[in-house]
Amino acid sequence: MSIKSDRWIRKMAEEHGMIEPYEPGQVRFNEAGDKLVSYGTSSYGYDVRCAREFKVFTNVHSAIVDPKNFDENSFIDIVGDECIIPPNSFALARTVEYFRIPRDVLTICLGKSTYARCGIIVNVTPLEPEWEGHVTLEFSNTTTLPARIYAGEGVAQMLFFQSDADDICETSYKDRGGKYQGQRGVTLPRT
C-alpha cells in the first residue's frame, strides 16, 4: 500500500466524488480574515471540518456505558459554532464532508496537532474500502479543564492508502453490509 498525494486526492474528489464538499487548497482564514484551524487538501492528506452538531457525554443518569446497549440519554445535543467538552469527558460530532472510499483504498484518520497540544484527542476508526458516509468523530478532553472545539474548522487529517492492483481486498465494507454504511449525522454505537 502506498500513501496518496494531493494530486490523487484532488482527482478522486473532483472526478469521483470521494470527498463532498471538497476544498482543493488549505483554508487558514475565514471570510472576515480571522484565523481558523486549517482544513482542506494538504500534501498527503485531507484535513476535515467538524459540523455544527455535537453530542456531549453526560452522567446525569449515572448509567453504565455499554457499547452493546448504549443509552442515547447519555448525551446532550448541541448545535452551534463551538462545543465545550467538560473535563475528562468526551463529545461526538461529525465531519462536514461526506466520504465515498474506493474499493482499493483504506483511509486512516489522525487528530490535528493544534488540538492534541491542548489535550483534546480525536479518535476515528479506519474508513474501510467502499465505506461511505459522514465520519463520526470522537473528541476526548484529557484535561482537568473544559475544552473548546470549533465547527467549520479543521479537526483531523485523513490519510489515503491505495493497495497494489494485485492486492485489492476480497470483501469490502459494502460487500459485508457494514452497520455504519451510508451514515449521515452523528451516529451512536450500533451492534
Curated annotation (Swiss-Prot):
Function, in words:
Catalyzes the deamination of dCTP to dUTP.
Active site (record annotation): E138
Name of the protein described by the UniProt record: dCTP deaminase
Q: Which PANTHER family match?
A: DCTP DEAMINASE
EC number, UniProt record: 3.5.4.13
Q: NCBIfam families, from UniProt? A: dCTP_deam
Report the family membership: Belongs to the dCTP deaminase family.
Q: Name one GO molecular function term.
A: dCTP deaminase activity
**Pathway the protein takes part in:** Pyrimidine metabolism; dUMP biosynthesis; dUMP from dCTP (dUTP route): step 1/2
Summarize where dCTP binds, as residue positions: K112, S113, T114, Y115, A116, R117, T136, L137, E138, Q157, Y173, Q183
- Gene giving rise to this polypeptide: dcd
Q: Which UniProt keywords apply?
A: Hydrolase, Nucleotide metabolism, Nucleotide-binding
What does the annotation say about its assembly with partners? Homotrimer.
Q: Which Pfam families match?
A: DCD
GO biological process per UniProt: dUMP biosynthetic process; dUTP biosynthetic process; nucleobase-containing small molecule interconversion
Which HAMAP family does this entry report, sorted A to Z?
dCTP_deaminase
Tell me which domain of life the UniProt entry assigns to the organism this sequence originates from: Bacteria
Which InterPro entries does the record associate with it? dCTP_deaminase, dUTPase-like_sf, dUTPase_trimeric
Organism expressing this protein natively:
Psychrobacter sp. (strain PRwf-1)
Reactions the enzyme catalyzes: dCTP + H2O + H(+) = dUTP + NH4(+)
